[in-house]
């Protein structure tokens, strides 16, 4: 089976290629923006923008579209270019190459609301309002894929962590080191979240590539929701990092984040705001996924969430020499 993967120089894409490079039944080809990479030499890697994808001399059986902007902050134009237009370019490539199976790596952020949500199913109502431009752009990309005439499916994974991650744990741990974390206090229902290790997500991407009859969409997670504040506290204790001292109510934090976003957007200021409304929502409200379809078609996850967390923490200790 020939698999073409976009976003090959990114966190998830590079992990997928390294994870399955020794599979004799797979021929892996990756497309990424970076000219330099640390991928195994047996991976056919092309440093190519997706607008030039038609120049690629490959006829894949499966295309996994994992490229895109994952940062929680950016302009609508940034997300349109990186998440919507790139999907359109990948679809055009697939049409030119005989309609291979297409797997879009979307996000559970399409469901996000400033409210508690439990066991969200794939057919849940989405939009018209979104908590982030990121979630909005991912849903726009999904709409394009739904119109593709070949085999296709959409993955909506939860938050992903692991070696190479720069968006989930690193910013939190960096803020904790500086004593900048704030605890968001919800007195009624504690925030919960689904998280999963990157290797587990990659396993499910490969299972989807091989599965005979795909559904239109799958929620993807480890199936072990965590209480967000308690989980973060446990991680910080294991790394001997300070726990949050200051507390804010979600409504106050949302107002602060909204003001900061306005300042960053209209002044404009460099970089990202220290907090965003999307981030406040993640740590203030419960958001868990129903993964019945994933389990029925692809089976249970290999490994456990707890062991994956411990593996990541050991990697973090090694990289930061914190113990």
Segment roles from a protein language model:
Residues 140, 166-171, 187-209, 215-219:
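Substrate-positioning beta->alpha
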Residues 89-133:
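Conserved Rossmann-fold NAD(P)-dependent oxidoreductase catalytic core, especially the SDR/UDP-sugar
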Residues 236-284:
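Terminal hydrophobic/aromatic helix or amphipathic segment near a protein terminus
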Residues 116-160, 165, 181:
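Catalytic helix-loop patch of NAD(P)-dependent Rossmann-fold dehydrogenases
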Residues 3-23:
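N-terminal Rossmann NAD(P)H-binding glycine-rich loop of SDR-like oxidoreductase domains
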Residues 37, 47-85, 89, 93-97, ...:
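NAD(P)H-binding glycine-rich loop region in Rossmannoid oxidoreductase-like domains
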Residues 163-165, 190-200, 218-238, 247-258, ...:
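Substrate-binding strand-loop-helix patch
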Residues 289-323:
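Amphipathic terminal alpha-helices
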């Amino acid at each position: 089976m020939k698999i073409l993967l976009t976003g090959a120089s990114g966190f998830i894409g590079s992990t997928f290629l390294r994870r399955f490079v020794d599979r004799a039944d797979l021929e892996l080809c990756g497309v990424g923006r970076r000219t330099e990479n640390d991928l195994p030499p047996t991976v056919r890697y092309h440093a190519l923008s997706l607008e030039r994808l038609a120049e690629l001399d490959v006829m894949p059986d499966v295309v996994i579209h994992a490229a895109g902007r994952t940062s929680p902050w950016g302009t609508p134009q940034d997300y349109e270019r990186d998440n919507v237009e790139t999907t359109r370019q990948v679809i055009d490539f697939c049409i030119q190459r005989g309609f291979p199976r297409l797997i879009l790596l979307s996000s559970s952020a399409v469901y996000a609301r400033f409210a508690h949500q439990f066991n969200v199913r794939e057919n849940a109502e989405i939009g018209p309002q979104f908590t982030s431009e990121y979630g909005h752009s991912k849903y726009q990309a999904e709409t394009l894929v739904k119109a593709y005439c070949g085999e296709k499916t959409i993955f909506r994974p939860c938050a992903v962590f692991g070696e190479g991650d720069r968006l989930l744990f690193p910013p939190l741990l960096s803020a904790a080191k500086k004593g900048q974390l704030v605890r968001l206090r919800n007195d009624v229902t504690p925030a919960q979240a689904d998280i999963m290790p990157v290797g587990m997500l990659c396993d499910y991407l490969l299972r989807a590539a091989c599965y005979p009859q795909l559904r239109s969409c799958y929620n993807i997670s480890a199936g072990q929701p965590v209480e967000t504040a308690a989980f973060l506290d446990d991680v910080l204790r294991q790394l001997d990092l300070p726990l949050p001292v200051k507390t804010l109510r979600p409504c106050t934090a949302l107002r602060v984040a909204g003001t900061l976003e306005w300042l960053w957007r209209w002044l404009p200021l460099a970089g990202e705001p220290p907090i965003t409304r999307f981030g406040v929502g993640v740590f203030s409200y419960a958001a868990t996924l129903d993964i019945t379809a994933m389990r029925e078609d692809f089976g249970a996850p290999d490994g456990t969430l707890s062991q994956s967390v411990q593996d990541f923490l050991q990697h973090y200790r090694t990289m930061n020499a914190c113990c």
